[in-house]
C-alpha cells in the first residue's frame, strides 16, 4: 500500500482497497476540488479532508461509520424538546449560510477552507450538495450539509448555535428521508457524537457494496426542492 499522487489532468482515483491502514483510510493526495473530481470521489466512497495549508488529502477509512435513519437514537430529553421545539426546519434554503456556519462555528479550527466552501457551493448549484437549515425567529441557528448519492446521503458537517439545533436538523431530515425512500447516511468516521445518535461502524467493503447499489436508486424528483420540513406548533 502506498499513497498515490493524483494528476490534475485526470479525475481517476485508485481503488479504496489500497488505502493506508495508518493513518486509517488515507488513499491519495493532490488533484483539485472540481465538481467532476468530487463526484467521482463520492461515487467511489472517497472524500476529501485536509488541514489549511496542506495538500488535498483523500480518504476511504475502514471501518466506515454509517447511520440507518430509522435507527436514529432520540433521547427522552430530545423528544420532549422537539415536542415544544421553537425551530423551523427547511431544506436547501440557505446552503451558503450553512456551510459558512460549519466553517466558522468550530473552536478547534476547521478543514472547511474558502476553497472547500466554493467547491461544495458549485456542487450545490449542480444539484448534488444539499443543506438542512434550522431557524429561530428568522435567524439561522443550526444546520447540516452533505452530498446525495441516490438514496444514500453523505453527511459532511453540521453546526449548532442554540440548544439541540443540529440534532433537530438531523431528526427532521431523517424522518423525511425515510418517508421518501432514503436508505442510508454516511457518517465517514465514528466519533462520540455520531455514536450517541445511533451511528455504527461497518467494514469498508460492505459500505462500498451499499454505495454501489443505493446510488443507482432515486429519491422522488421533488425531494431536494427547497421547502419547509418542519414548523413549530402555534
From Swiss-Prot:
Q: Its GO biological process terms?
A: protein catabolic process
What Pfam family is a match for this entry?
Leu_Phe_trans
Report the EC number(s), separated by commas if there are several.
2.3.2.6
Write out the entry's keywords from A to Z: Acyltransferase, Cytoplasm, Transferase
Query: Which GO cellular component terms, listed alphabetically, does the Swiss-Prot or TrEMBL entry include?
Result: cytoplasm
Gene Ontology terms for molecular function: leucyl-tRNA--protein transferase activity
Spell out the reaction equation it catalyses: N-terminal L-lysyl-[protein] + L-leucyl-tRNA(Leu) = N-terminal L-leucyl-L-lysyl-[protein] + tRNA(Leu) + H(+); N-terminal L-arginyl-[protein] + L-leucyl-tRNA(Leu) = N-terminal L-leucyl-L-arginyl-[protein] + tRNA(Leu) + H(+); L-phenylalanyl-tRNA(Phe) + an N-terminal L-alpha-aminoacyl-[protein] = an N-terminal L-phenylalanyl-L-alpha-aminoacyl-[protein] + tRNA(Phe)
**Top-level class of the enzyme under EC nomenclature:** transferase
Localization, UniProt = Cytoplasm
Superkingdom is Bacteria
The UniProt family comment states: Belongs to the L/F-transferase family.
**Classification via HAMAP family:** Leu_Phe_trans
Main function? Functions in the N-end rule pathway of protein degradation where it conjugates Leu, Phe and, less efficiently, Met from aminoacyl-tRNAs to the N-termini of proteins containing an N-terminal arginine or lysine.
* Name used for this protein in its record: Leucyl/phenylalanyl-tRNA--protein transferase
Q: Which organism is it from?
A: Citrobacter koseri (strain ATCC BAA-895 / CDC 4225-83 / SGSC4696)
Lineage, broadest ranks? Bacteria, Pseudomonadati, Pseudomonadota, Gammaproteobacteria, Enterobacterales
